[in-house]
Amino acid sequence: MAKATKEEKIILITNDDGITSPGIKNLVEAVKGLGKIIVVAPDKPQSGMGHAITIGSPLRMNKVDLFNGIEAWQTSGTPVDCVKLAVDKILHRKPDICLSGINHGANHSINVIYSGTMSAAMEASIEGIPSIGFSLLDYRYEADMEPSRKIVHIIVSKIMAQKKIDKHLLLNVNIPSIPYKEIKGIKICKQAYAKYDEAFDERVDPQGKKYFWLTGEFKNFDKGRDTDVWALQHNSVSVVPVQFDLTNYTLKKHLEKTISFK
């Protein structure tokens, strides 16, 4: 299993688009030279899996040679399974940082809830591993990843250069799909309040059986200039600090005054 020298920093890389996706290959290229890279990713696309884990069926993993000599493992599980397996079965110590992506498609605003990319990063954060999820606003398999590679390198190198990194650091980074020279900067944001106006399109398959296909339109209700959606619409990279503590502290204080009793 993977081992690094005591001085060597370990970079765990995963994703939800699968181990053969262009996104993860570009993520690996972006951080070469920053530490010992270990790739653990799903053997097939797992988009939209959220924080799902595999229960009641076996998990399998095997070593693959897909990254020019960099140690890599593919698993039959979800993105979160990949992180769990990496920490428990592959690495001899916790990685110094976990990077997830580069996702093909946006994970801003409400997307973070459904995202396998961000759930993998969140799982690592729960384990006390600083983590970053990267997404490009381009769903195409042939998307131009060169600008993303540059942004990834800038952000990761700055984070890893810090003397002490918060072990629960969790960042959701989204990158506009434009040439690098057109990117106006990196903006620290809050998550926009947005959702999908969803509908299930009813269809019939060749056997005459009814099935449903999820469709929908993205709607942003938050027009503030401090949101990830606004930053991306104005050609900036959005960086949202995220946390796995879902407690609503404002409501908690209110409820303590209204319904709490001893």
Outline where the language-model segments fall.
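Short, glycine-rich nucleotide/cofactor-binding loops
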Residues: 13-20, 111-112
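Glycine/threonine-rich flexible loop motifs
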Residues: 106-115
